[in-house]
Amino acid sequence: MGTIIYAVGWTQHSFGTQIIRTAAILQLLLGNVGRAGGGVNALRGHSNIQGATDMAGVFDILPGYLKVPIPTDVDFKTYLERTTPKTVKPAEWDSFNYWSNTPKFAVSLLKAMYGPAATKENDWAFNYLPKVDRNYSWVNIWNDMYEGKVKGIFAFGMNGVMIGPDSQKNIDALKKADWLVVCEIYPDETSEFWKAPGITAEELKKINTTVYRLPGAGFAEKDGTFVNSARWLQWKNVALPPPGRAKVDQEILATIFLKVRELYRKEGGKFPDPILNAWFPYTDPKNPALSELAKEINGKALADLTDPKTNQTIKAGQQLPGFAWLKDDGTTLGGNWLYCGSWTEAGAMIQRRGTEDPSGLGIYPNWAWSWPANRRVMYNRASCDLDGKPWDPERRQVWWDEAKQTWVGNDVPDFKADSPPKDHMGPFIMNQEGLGRLFVWLNDGPFPEHYEPIENPIPNPLHPDRSHNPVVKKYKTPLDKYGTPEQGFNVICTTYRLTEHYHYWTKNNPMNVQLVPEPFVEVPYELAQSMGLQGGEKVKVTSARSHYIAKAMVTRRIRPMKIDGKEMFQIGIPIHWGFRGIAEDADKTAKTLVNQLTPTVIDPNAFTPEFKGFLVKIEKA
C-alpha cells in the first residue's frame, strides 16, 4: 500500500493536470485507490483550500461541485439534461451513478439561496443564477482588467499583485481599474499598488483608481471552519477578538450585500430579482451567526418527510441527517449536498473531538466530520475483492455482511449499502459507469502526455515539433513576452515557499522576519563558481518580462542537471517578499517581486499558472 502526495510542484505547470492524472492512473493500476493509506493526496499551501473549492470559490462550479449554468441552459430542465449523467452499465457490471441525484442537490441549493422565492412555477429561480459565458478564472479576470474590460475587483484576503503571474501586468491592470476594494489585516502590495517601484510621480497623477481598504480579521480572530485535504470539516474557535475597527468576514459581506439590496430597492436596476429575492433569514442580518450559516449549508426539511423504507420521520424545520434525504420537489434546502450531515439535530458534528481509532487505520471517525457522510476513505468498496472480502484481512475497512445483507465496516461504506457482491456494482459510484477511468475528458487529451514548459531550454524529446501543451493559453498583450535560450535566457528558474513564512503575510510578523529576514536567490554551487559569485553578494535575475534583485544563497541543494547531454543550471527564488513589509519598509530589500519574472501561461484544465519552470539569465547586481 502506498500514497502519492503532491503539492504545487506538480500543479503549477502548463501541464499540471497531466502530471496528476498520471499519478491517478498509476494508483488505479496498483490497486491503491479506495484503501486507507493509498490514493493521490494534495498538500495545500493554505489550511482551507479544500473548503474554498467545496463551496465554489472558483468560477466553474456551484457548491458541492454542481456544474454552473451556461447560456444554452435556457431553463432548469435543459440544465439538468446537460449536467445529470446517464447511467452506463458496462458488460456485467451494475452502476450506482450517484450524480444521477443532481436534480435533488440542485433544487435544494436553489431553495437555500432563494427560499420562498424559489418555486416549481418559476423553475426554482434557476434563471436568477448567472450564466457563465466564458473562462472567468483568476488569470483571465486580471487580463480582462488589464484590457479595460473589468472595472473593479474585491480582493478579500488575496494579494493579487503578489500572487501573479507577471506581477507587473497585475499592477498595470489595477492602474486601469475604476475601483478596488481590499479586505486585509495588513497594508499589502495590492492595496498600495501605486507604491510599486518604477511608478513615477508623473505616472502617479494619471492613476484614477479609487481604493477602499476594509480592516478584516485574521483566522485566529474569528470562528469558522477549515476543511483539509482528507475532507475533514473542522470547527475552529476564535482565539482573540479582532483589534480596533476590524470586523469578521460575514459582517463585512452582509453589510455590503444589505446596502446593495437597499440601492436596488430604491433605484431599480437591469435585473434586480436575484438580489431582492436572495434569502437572508438570519437572526442578525448585519452579522449572521456562523452556526446559522453552517446549519443552512447542512440543510433542513421544509415539510414533514418520511423514509418509506424505515418509516423514519423528519419534521419540517429539522436538520437533515444526511444527503439521502434531499428532495427535488422543494421540500428540502441545503447549501451544499456534500456537507449534509455535518450539523444535524444531534448537534455540530464538525465540533467533535473524539480521538479514538478502534480500527488502527487512522480513521478517527469521531474527530470532526468528513464529507461525504463522515466517510474517511472515498471509494472504499475498492478495498474488497469481487466477493466483498477485504484484500487485506488485517486492515479491514469495509466488507459485505451476508447475514445482514448489507455493507458494514470500520468506515462508512462508500457504496449502495444493500447491493450484494453478486450484482457486480462498480466501486467508483460517482462515475456514471461505476469504474475507474484510464481515459478521461480533459481539454488537452484523454491520456497523459509529456510536455515541456512554455519556456524550455530543449525541445521535447518525444516530439520536438510540439514541445509544449498545444492547447495551453498564452496571452498576447504587450506585456506578455516569452523567453528563449537564443535570447540569452539559459538558466531554469523555479519559485517556492519557505517553512518559516506563510505566503505574503508573515513578512509583517517580527518573529517570522527574525527567522528569515530578507529575500534571496538560491544558486547552485557550480553556477556560482562559474560566475565568481560568493554567498551574500547581490544578483540580478532577468526574464523576458522583468528582473529581480536579491542576495545570493549559494547551496549544493540544487544540483546541475544533464539535459540532452548538456549541463544546465536551475535557480530557486522564494515568493514571500515584495515592496510592503517589515524588511521592505526598512529599505532592506530591492522591493522587487519574484512574480514579475513569471509568464502568464495557464494549464488548460485547472487554469493554474506556470510558476515552476521558466527561463532567466543571472548576473551579479
Residue ranges and their predicted role:
Residues 3, 34-41, 266-274:
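Flexible, glycine/charged-enriched surface loops at secondary-structure junctions
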Residues 5-7, 380:
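Aromatic-residue-lined binding/catalytic grooves and analogous aromatic/hydrophobic interfacial grooves
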Residues 7-14, 43-47, 51, 294, ...:
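Substrate-binding/catalytic subdomain of NAD(P)-dependent oxidoreductase enzymes
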Residues 10-13, 239-245:
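Active-site rim elements
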Residues 28-210, 215-223, 311-529:
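Extended redox/cofactor-interaction regions of prokaryotic respiratory oxidoreductases
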Residues 182-188, 193-195, 203, 241-257, ...:
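Phosphate/diphosphate-binding loops
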Residues 209-212, 219-241, 575, 600:
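Glycine/threonine-rich phosphate-binding loop and adjacent beta-strand/alpha-helix elements that clamp
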Residues 251-307, 408-421, 428-434, 439-461, ...:
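Long, contiguous, secondary-structure-rich segments that constitute the structural scaffold
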